[in-house]
Amino acid sequence: MPFALGQRWISDTESELGLGTVVQVEGRMVTVLFPATGENRMFSRNEAPLTRVIYNPGDTVESHEGWSLSVEELTEKDDLVVYHGIHSETGEKVSLRETLLNHNIRFNKPQDRLFAGQIDRLDRFGIRYQCQLLRHQLATSDLLGLQGPRVGLIPHQMWIAHEVGRRYAPRVLLADEVGLGKTIEAGLIIHQQLLTCRAERVLIIVPDTLRHQWLVEMLRRFNLRFSVFDEDRCVEAFADHDNPFYTEQLVICSLELLRKKKRLDQALDADWDLLVVDEAHHLEWTEEAPSRAYQVVEALSEVVPGVLLLTATPDQLGHESHFARLRLLDPDRFYDYDAFLAEENSYKDVAIAAEALAGESKLSDYAINSLTELLSEKDIAPSIRLIQAEGIDSELQQAARSELLQELLDRHGTGRVLYRNSRASVKGFPKRIFNAYPHAMPEQYLTAARVNDMMGGRKSLEAKAAQALSPEKLYQEFEDNSASWWKFDPRVDWLIEFLKSHRSKKVLIIASGADTALSLEEALRTREGIQATVFHEGMSIIERDKAGAYFAQEEGGAQALICSEIGSEGRNFQFASHLVLFDLPLNPDLLEQRIGRLDRIGQKNDIQIHLPYLQDTAQERLLQWYHQGLNAFELTCPGGHILFSEFAEELLNVLVGGDEDELTNLLNHTQSRYKELKHAMEQGRDKLLEINSHGGDKAKAIVERLAQSDQDTKLIGSVIRLWDIIGVDQEDKGENSIILRPSEHMMFPTYPGLHEDGVTVTFDRDTALSRDDIALITQEHPLVQTGLDLITGSDTGTTSVAILKNKALPAGTLFLELIYMADASAPKSSQLYRYLPPTPIRILLDKNGNDLSAKVDYTSFDKQLSAVNRHIGSKLVTASQPILHPLFAKGEEYAQVAVNELVAQAREKMTSQLTGELERLESLKAVNPNIREEELEYLRNQMQELTTYLDASQLQLDAIRMVLVSHV
């Protein structure tokens, strides 16, 4: 390379250094000073990664004094270029030596980089274009936020997430029956809200025992990095901010922390966008005396726009508490309990009409009259005639049914506020098989019971029943706490033999208390050396997680996990299918929670429930009440709480000392009431809720589309190529997985999310679901999003020169391929990308300025091209400059026309969608008070803002590829 002192060069590898000046040429070395940063670089003269900067007539250059020059002519003196042209401020003709050019010039624009000789590799141009297409594809998907999470594609979960996640500030109660995946539904909604920037700050409130589990679930399933806050963390965070909650965007904490006034005040002041409350059935409320827990959540719900309440049992603490939870979501709507009860009674007619529409038979006169009355503001006669007609296309009839059903759901009930799926409406659950094992009552327990009776003392019926149900605890009271009751209890003997005969099976054992759980572990370990681990309230969260992980290990793990009652709240072990109930809880909801640890959607085997019990005791009588009265072992019993509250006194009397006649009467009354309640619960709003909550055919369609996306081989190829070009090491691990590691030759110094020790990933959802240590890669995964951002946020691939070997065209024929981006600057929370996402516009010009892009598609054109090295490419660009400048102007004209069309389409789409949604909600608000004014106001404001942003849309040249025809 010919170097001379004072010449201006730019570094091909460190363009951020700005414009360099040659300060020394000695022997085979050249030294360049980069004044903008004050750094020197020494290069070999023959292999220097440098490009000479020479501007051309028509360019504008800036002097080191700040004024600009419009270049008209170039001359050369002493190997230095002198620019002649018009001074930007005075209008006079002036000259400027290249030595006096502004040092801070950086060639970020593709044209500048092209003419400065900064030519990228051919494959980098291709990957940049592919990255822009992927970003556009993701932004325009109406399933954004549902593809990325590592969860099974279960229709009702995807439907709820799709419906709720795209709302502004959703306020809903997720109340699916136990085992249907409320945590996953909440995670999907959170993920969607964050990905679309409808929310940025999220607070999750959970019981102490579930904080770490939520932390792990959010990270492992949804790639969301929450922080757990306790008192110690708040004190520690005070060093960074007066309000510790401002130090993180995504926070998990317990209700216990927020019971403290100081912490609650700080949480109230922390500008959350979304509040999530798990186990919301613990929020007890009466009008006269709301619980402290309820008051905490109520205060937060008044200042946080979005609220998700999770509860498996809306009526667990009574119907009044269920009303109170709805009141948290919308106090204007649910203002009076009596009015709420009266409204619920009216749901029966709605449910009958909805069920008729959901079926396939002709509508009865009663159903038609009900529909006409319920939808009185709408003329439904044409739809009714279509449904009732003979010989009509069944698809048309089904469409009419669906339309009326949607109108019904929109206008009546709590469908927008409450989502509740029952097992009756969701398929995919295993059978529950109940096995009972009777044993004689040990003499030691009988003696302890007699002594207890002789001592007398005042005790409540419930306390007496608890003693009768757990004779080992009573025995310990009279002996001592270390009494080895497990040495003679026949249930323990049975348990040991059962585990020995099922050595290859994982077995979950649940007992009511921690002491019992610890004693059982000691018995299994000391008597037979059986590997078991315990899980109880006396353990730290980390200890519990370790116990759960030890139990989950297939090789070398514990055969049995012994839990106290807390083990049946929030923890899931569906990889096991054997459940041993060492005793029975008095509350049927707790029994269902115990069984629900294994009986969950996704369980692949039938659940074997084993109950060893002592004959002729309270244990046997409670077993009979659960099994014969409620059928609670083999089926879920959603009305269990109601039945327990109605028969509590009668049941307690039978448990403490009732005779056979009293037991028989209790069982008969319970069975009769159970049937009544079951029939009643099949009527009214539950059916209406289920129709709205599981999504039907629409939910199935969403899942089918997501499954098709999972099989998109083009995406897999694009992502693998992206990692190849960035320089990520990829090691095939087998089992549909690869290990990604950063390499020394990566294009970028860091790749956020890619750790030094690597990460194992898969594109196969089933593989990811079966292996907690393997990440599921979709276009929503942070590793993919980061890769796209690294490429599109840098100048990688913005310029390229290629050769087209085609003898049908004259040698030297030139083509100019331009990639423009149509974009508008707007906060992501505005949702502008739904209508005008960053859109790549491809223009392919011949030398006469004709756009050939419609005739020559990108892929087929790209396959015919060959790369050239940077130096040859730079020379070809320099030689072609007279042709290129007018082509750039022509390309911008074509692109501007395309942008104008995109903006017009975006404006039309936005106006149509938002006006339609606004009109729909305004008309619904007249008949369904569940429509909140905040949602309407949000839509009105959004239309105004989006119009402003669209008017300011811009066109930006993103990448250039110059192609020359060669016959060589």
Swiss-Prot record:
Protein EC: 3.6.4.-
PROSITE patterns (UniProt xref): HELICASE_ATP_BIND_1, HELICASE_CTER
Pfam families membership: Helicase_C, RapA_C, SNF2-rel_dom, Tudor_1_RapA, Tudor_RapA
Keyword NAD annotated: no
KW Hydrolase (keyword) present: yes
Gene3D superfamilies per record: 2.30.30.140, 2.30.30.930, 3.30.360.80, 6.10.140.1500, 6.10.140.2230, P-loop containing nucleotide triphosphate hydrolases, Tandem AAA-ATPase domain
InterPro entries: Helicase_ATP-bd, Helicase_C-like, Helicase_RapA, P-loop_NTPase, RapA_C, SNF2-like_sf, SNF2/RAD54-like_C, SNF2_N
Binding of ATP, residues: D176, E177, V178, G179, L180, G181, K182, T183
Gene Ontology MF terms in the entry: ATP binding; DNA binding; helicase activity; hydrolase activity, acting on acid anhydrides
Residue ranges occupied by any Helicase ATP-binding domain in the UniProt entry: 163-332
Domain Helicase C-terminal: 491-655
First-tier enzyme category under EC: hydrolase
Keywords: Activator, ATP-binding, DNA-binding, Helicase, Hydrolase, Nucleotide-binding, Transcription, Transcription regulation
UniProt motif DEAH box: location: 278-281
GO biological process per UniProt: regulation of DNA-templated transcription
HAMAP family the record matches: Helicase_RapA
Job of this protein: Transcription regulator that activates transcription by stimulating RNA polymerase (RNAP) recycling in case of stress conditions such as supercoiled DNA or high salt concentrations. Probably acts by releasing the RNAP, when it is trapped or immobilized on tightly supercoiled DNA. Does not activate transcription on linear DNA. Probably not involved in DNA repair.
Oligomeric and partner information: Interacts with the RNAP. Has a higher affinity for the core RNAP than for the holoenzyme. Its ATPase activity is stimulated by binding to RNAP.
Family label: Belongs to the SNF2/RAD54 helicase family. RapA subfamily.
Record protein name field: RNA polymerase-associated protein RapA
Lineage per the UniProt record: Bacteria, Pseudomonadati, Pseudomonadota, Gammaproteobacteria, Alteromonadales
